[in-house]
Amino acid sequence: MEAFPWAPRSPRRGRAPPPMALVPSARYVSAPGPAHPQPFSSWNDYLGLATLITKAVDGEPRFGCARGGNGGGGSPPSSSSSSCCSPHTGAGPGALGPALGPPDYDEDDDDDSDEPGSRGRYLGSALELRALELCAGPAEAGLLEERFAELSPFAGRAAAVLLGCAPAAAAAATTTSEATPREERAPAWAAEPRLHAASGAAAARLLKPELQVCVFCRNNKEAMALYTTHILKGPDGRVLCPVLRRYTCPLCGASGDNAHTIKYCPLSKVPPPPARPPPRSARDGPPGKKLR
């Protein structure tokens, strides 16, 4: 978050408020203190917001939605929370909107509003994931897994393992991590897409036929419809190109399966024998010289 220079709201108020810090209770409160020793947790603050708000409304008497409150001890917590959180509910001192809104500073009680416990005392413990006992039993763990299923990239009970909600799974994960070095371990959810991608590419290569190209016809500027229908030579070395098979080498006379051009003819690579010098005679001597 960007920090902007603070400007006093009135000439009377000349000192800046203490620095703010985000804590797992999803509230901006004063700098770290004994009331909020835990670090910021994205699972508690963002992904589990619906669960946390529901549990906070069910268990907080300040909102007027406490279990068994208002003479409705037999009503389930979900009905009370839904009626309290309904947009048609009238605004009042116990409504959820004003309670969860940003704290309103009053110029007359500056000293009281700056205390760390005054702003988050009624939400500090109610919105804690561990304090709400979401993972107390198998039913609660399953409910939490369902809530995080669509938001989490992990499948099955991996979300419960990450949140510490499955003791057996957590113990198994701890044993595996102790037995296997950190460098050799790779999460299954990260390796599985790569395997699928690799297998898909290999299958595509196997199913897609390779394009046949005859280099002889292509180099001779033949049409693409012609040089993409065959190849020059087969695996056994025989010539398969119909154009080259009809060609006859002028040096050795080869054609058909052994057809080739002059450039690749074996006779063209043999150096010609050196020319013999003519026999020396009197006629070959330089003019003007007489032989004795």
Curated annotation (Swiss-Prot):
The keyword Electron transport belongs to this UniProt entry's keyword annotation: no
UniProt-recorded Gene Ontology molecular function terms: enzyme activator activity; mRNA binding; translation repressor activity; zinc ion binding
Tissue: Testis and ovary (at protein level). Predominantly expressed in testis. Specifically expressed during germline development. In adult tissues, it is mainly expressed in spermatogonia, the stem cells of the germline. Also expressed during meiosis in spermatocytes. Not present in late, post-meiotic stage germ cells. Expressed in fetal ovaries, while it is weakly or not expressed in mature postmeiotic oocytes, suggesting that it may be expressed in premeiotic female germ cells. Expressed at high levels only in the E-cadherin deficient cell lines.
Cellular compartment(s): Cytoplasm, Perinuclear region; Cytoplasm
Key word Lipoprotein present: no
Keyword vocabulary terms for this entry: Cytoplasm, Disease variant, Metal-binding, Repressor, RNA-binding, Translation regulation, Zinc, Zinc-finger
Motif C2HC 1 per record, residues: 214-241
Subunit structure, as described in the record: Interacts with PUM2, SNAPIN and CTNNB1. Interacts (via N-terminal region) with CTNND1. Interacts with DDX20 (via N-terminal region).
Related illness: Spermatogenic failure 12: An infertility disorder caused by spermatogenesis defects. It results in decreased sperm motility, concentration, and multiple sperm structural defects. Non-obstructive azoospermia, oligozoospermia and oligo-astheno-teratozoospermia are features observed in SPGF12 patients.
Functional note: May act as a translational repressor which regulates translation of specific mRNAs by forming a complex with PUM2 that associates with the 3'-UTR of mRNA targets. Capable of interfering with the proadhesive and anti-invasive functions of E-cadherin. Up-regulates the production of MMP14 to promote tumor cell invasion.
Name by which UniProt lists this protein: Nanos homolog 1
